[in-house]
């Protein structure tokens, strides 16, 4: 019989957010099975034009071969030491992901944690890598900021689920920029699109917003691929405590926003803590800069919290997590809430046992909370065990990551016809004035570039 924790966790790790069952599913259109899934179509570009790509679609980020660069860093980050200069073969990291549901529900924290999560993905590439600069894209329905904008009057104002488009554009851009400012990563470019349309009794609009966080970074070619875990590797968590934050984010974000009660949806939104993430990053950076990197593998804590992050670390061999070693900031948390909360700004690492003390010293110097919470076992099971020996979660790895039921999307082609716009040459100046008022036209810096470029000056844009 499954426990409450196992049922709850299974809903998260098998959500569309985590497993891409629709994205990787089979489409049957007009009775004809399509040759490729959406995911396969995207991967095809890399398959046919690999160029200098080293890793894609199998890690937190994609890596492409970079130039040889000169690294200036301390020889030993666990103590005061001399800086040394050495050449490293670099790789360039690229990443982009959406954070639509959280930004729709609570735009400031939704966009802030979208940027923060994307940064952590670049931190978690291979055995660790370094973020440099970020991007952000926002898409909403018309914001209706001023009167006298006729294109915004075609559709009536709806009963918005949580925030108006105007509030979302302001708060989301503030949130993404706030995280960049506090973490120390410039947002160097981005875009914004607002759109609504009605024709043939069909209505279009970004009522559920799109917030796309992206970025670029770099790492060493030595560390661009994850290592294989072996029995006895230590499971380490670096970052903040567990709280009742972000519960069910993976599953809730995989369905239509508004399907669940506002209490459930608001509880599924994470909260941002850029300072804690910077501390965790400083540890990752330090380990990557040293002559020998003790990290076997690394993942970030995002959707489904500990259970998703740590299970991915030990997927090849299994692992046991001691719940008494997990930091709990709220003593009222249940077992499932400890296991699967999405308190942000945490990284999970597999560390060679003999290097634990060295990593601990680095973490202490960076004021980054570090916890050795378990180890790999080799029994191909993944379990969380309480101090009294009870295991609220204990499943075979195969049960967690085995092949999900194949998803089939059956549909038919719908022919749509749209009228060509009608223009009057005498109104050319009026048309031009209106077009230039659209948020999607011209420079977007007023919305996207609120992060101080001095943090990593000179920035990549410079």
Where are these regions (language model features)?
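Glycine/proline-enriched, intrinsically flexible loops and inter-domain linkers
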Residues: 1-457, 461
């Amino acid at each position: 019989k499954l426990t409450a924790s196992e049922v709850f966790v299974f809903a998260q790790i098998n959500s569309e957010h985590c497993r891409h069952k629709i994205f990787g599913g089979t489409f049957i259109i007009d009775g004809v099975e399509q040759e490729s899934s959406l995911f396969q179509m995207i991967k095809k570009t890399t398959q046919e034009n690999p160029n200098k790509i080293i890793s894609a679609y199998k890690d937190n980020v994609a890596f492409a071969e970079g130039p040889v660069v000169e690294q200036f860093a301390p020889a030993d980050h666990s103590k005061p030491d001399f800086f040394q200069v050495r050449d490293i073969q670099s790789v360039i990291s690229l990443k982009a992901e959406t954070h639509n549901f959280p930004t729709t529900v609570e735009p400031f924290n939704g966009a802030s944690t979208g940027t923060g999560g994307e940064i952590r993905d670049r931190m978690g590439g291979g055995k660790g890598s370094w973020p440099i600069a970020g991007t952000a894209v926002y898409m909403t329905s018309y914001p209706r900021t001023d009167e006298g904008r006729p294109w915004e009057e075609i559709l009536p104002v709806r009963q918005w689920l949580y925030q108006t488009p105007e509030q979302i554009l302001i708060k989301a851009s503030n949130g993404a920029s706030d995280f960049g400012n506090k973490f120390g990563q410039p947002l160097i470019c981005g875009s914004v699109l607002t759109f609504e349309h009605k024709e043939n009794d069909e209505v279009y609009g970004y009522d559920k917003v799109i917030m796309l966080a992206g970025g670029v970074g770099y790492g060493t070619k030595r560390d661009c691929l994850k290592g294989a875990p072996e029995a006895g590797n230590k499971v380490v968590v670096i970052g903040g405590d567990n709280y009742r934050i972000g519960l069910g984010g993976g599953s809730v974000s995989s369905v239509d926003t508004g399907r669940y009660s506002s209490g459930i949806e608001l509880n599924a939104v994470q909260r941002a803590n850029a300072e804690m993430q910077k501390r965790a990053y400083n540890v990752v950076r330090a380990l990557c800069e040293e002559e020998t990197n003790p990290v076997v593998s690394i993942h970030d804590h995002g959707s489904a919290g500990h259970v998703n992050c740590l299970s991915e670390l030990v997927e090849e061999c299994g692992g046991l997590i001691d719940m008494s070693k997990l930091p709990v900031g709220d003593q009222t948390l249940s077992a499932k809430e400890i296991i699967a909360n999405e308190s942000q700004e945490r990284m999970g690492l597999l560390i060679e046992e003999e290097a634990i003390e060295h990593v601990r010293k680095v973490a202490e110097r960076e004021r980054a909370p570090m916890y050795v919470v378990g180890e790999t076992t080799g029994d191909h099971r993944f379990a969380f065990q309480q101090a009294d020996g009870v295991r609220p979660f204990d499943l075979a790895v195969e049960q967690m990551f085995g092949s999900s039921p194949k998803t089939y999307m059956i549909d038919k082609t719908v022919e749509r016809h749209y009228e060509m716009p009608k223009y009057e040459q005498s109104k050319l100046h009026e048309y031009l004035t209106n077009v230039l008022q659209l948020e999607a036209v011209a420079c977007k810096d007023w919305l996207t570039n609120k992060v101080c470029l001095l943090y990593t000056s000179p920035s990549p844009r410079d």
